[in-house]
Amino acid sequence: MASKKIDRLSFDATLEELETIVHQLEQGSLPLEEALKQFEQGVHLVRAGQQKLEQAEQKIQILLTQADGTEQAVPFQPEQGEE
């Protein structure tokens, strides 16, 4: 998958693709060249995923900034089923 295509993936699709690659690498049945290619692809996916998370964090900060410019600290409270 080309780097530009990775950038277009949603975060969930990026994570799913990364999980597939990790599973393939953990099996240990890929030839060395293919394993290296998959590893490189995984690195690109990790970087893209991190970037998407950083962008989401920035959007949240913008949304939590009050009209007077001060930031409102809102603690994260997971829903009961997510702990």
Curated annotation (Swiss-Prot):
Keywords: Cytoplasm, Exonuclease, Hydrolase, Nuclease. GO terms for molecular function: exodeoxyribonuclease VII activity. The keyword Chaperone does not apply. GO terms for cellular component: cytosol; exodeoxyribonuclease VII complex. It catalyses: Exonucleolytic cleavage in either 5'- to 3'- or 3'- to 5'-direction to yield nucleoside 5'-phosphates. It holds the Pfam family Exonuc_VII_S. It is found in: Cytoplasm. Its main location: cytoplasm. One of its GO terms (biological process) is DNA catabolic process. Its EC number is 3.1.11.6. NCBIfam families: PRK00977.1-1, PRK00977.1-4, xseB. Bidirectionally degrades single-stranded DNA into large acid-insoluble oligonucleotides, which are then degraded further into small acid-soluble oligonucleotides. Belongs to the XseB family. HAMAP family: Exonuc_7_S. Heterooligomer composed of large and small subunits. This is Exodeoxyribonuclease 7 small subunit. The lineage of its organism: Bacteria, Pseudomonadati, Pseudomonadota, Gammaproteobacteria, Aeromonadales. The gene is xseB.
